């Protein structure tokens, strides 16, 4: 590999030349404007890009081991198939930039601002994203084992088919974040803020959400077996067709939450608020509803066999065609055994079918 000086690099960029197969180990490009540069198979190990501007620059198959990008500004920058082990992007600003099939093990992204950044098929083991501002960033099919994303803020971020079981999100906040088919099993999400987040078809078994905010979150089709959901605020959250078997949900807010078709077998809701909760067609055999406030809740067509409703508060709580064999009640005051109008409509429909026969 040949060598180039910083001035020669700048000249080649201005001429539109591709800079390829050169050894630039340890070179200082501090504060340089490398916008529009095209680099292929260049060794930038130990180089210093601090405060540089990389707008619409492309780096392909380059080596960036322990390279310093602190306070760099990347806009529409592409890093593809690069080895960036232990590189440092601390206090960098990354906008609409892409890391594709890059090795980013132990890379530091501390206190960075990321807008529309994409990490696709990257190796991010032990990467450090402490105190990041993520706005519309995307993680796709990347490895995040032991990566640190502590004290970070996520807005409209997407995690697509990610294994997040060993990722550290301590003290982070998530707003409208999408987790699509992700694996979180056994994760510790205590005291985290999740607002209007999507957990569609996720694996959340044994996840600890205690004392977290889950308002307006969507857990449709997700598995939450043995999950810890105590002292949470899950107001107007969606648990449609979710599996909360043996989940611990006591002393929590589920007002306006929707559980249609969910599995709630042996789920513990003791002392929780379930006002206006929609629990139609749930299977809640052996579930615990002791001391719950179920004002205006709808349990139509649910299987509540052997469940415990002692000391629960009912007011216009609908048990329309609800299975209740072996269920325990202190009293049934406030329970509507059926919806008269719906009952009449069902009877009429049954009669019409019989006449056709």
Model feature map: region roles:
Residues 2-357:
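Tandem repeat scaffolds
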């Amino acid at each position: 590999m040949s060598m180039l000086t910083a001035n020669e690099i700048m000249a080649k960029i201005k001429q539109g030349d591709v800079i390829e197969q050169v050894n630039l180990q340890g070179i200082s490009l501090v504060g340089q404007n490398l916008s529009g540069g095209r680099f292929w198979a260049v060794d930038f190990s130990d180089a210093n890009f601090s405060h540089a501007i990389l707008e619409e620059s492309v780096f392909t198959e380059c080596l960036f081991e322990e390279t310093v990008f602190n306070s760099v500004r990347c806009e529409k920058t592409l890093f593809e198939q690069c080895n960036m082990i232990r590189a440092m992007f601390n206090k960098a600003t990354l906008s609409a930039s892409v890391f594709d099939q890059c090795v980013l093990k132990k890379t530091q992204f501390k206190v960075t601002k990321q807008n529309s950044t994409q990490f696709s098929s990257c190796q991010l083991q032990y990467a450090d994203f402490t105190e990041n501002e993520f706005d519309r960033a995307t993680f796709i099919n990347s490895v995040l084992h032991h990566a640190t994303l502590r004290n970070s803020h996520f807005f409209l971020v997407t995690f697509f088919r990610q294994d997040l079981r060993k990722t550290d999100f301590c003290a982070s906040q998530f707003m409208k974040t999408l987790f699509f088919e992700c694996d979180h099993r056994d994760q510790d999400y205590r005291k985290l803020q999740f607002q209007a987040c999507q957990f569609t078809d996720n694996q959340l078994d044994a996840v600890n959400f205690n004392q977290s905010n889950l308002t307006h979150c969507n857990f449709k089709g997700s598995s939450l077996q043995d999950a810890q959901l105590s002292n949470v605020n899950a107001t107007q959250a969606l648990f449609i067709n979710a599996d909360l078997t043996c989940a611990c949900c006591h002393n929590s807010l589920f007002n306006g939450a929707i559980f249609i078709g969910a599995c709630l077998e042996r789920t513990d809701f003791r002392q929780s608020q379930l006002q206006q909760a929609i629990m139609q067609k749930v299977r809640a055999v052996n579930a615990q509803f002791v001391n719950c406030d179920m004002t205006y809740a709808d349990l139509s067509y649910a299987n509540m066999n052997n469940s415990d409703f002692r000391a629960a508060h009912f007011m216009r709580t609908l048990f329309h065609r609800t299975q209740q064999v072996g269920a325990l009640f202190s009293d049934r005051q406030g329970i509507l055994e059926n919806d008269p109008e719906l009952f009449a409509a069902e009877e009429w429909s049954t009669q019409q079918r019989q006449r056709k026969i």
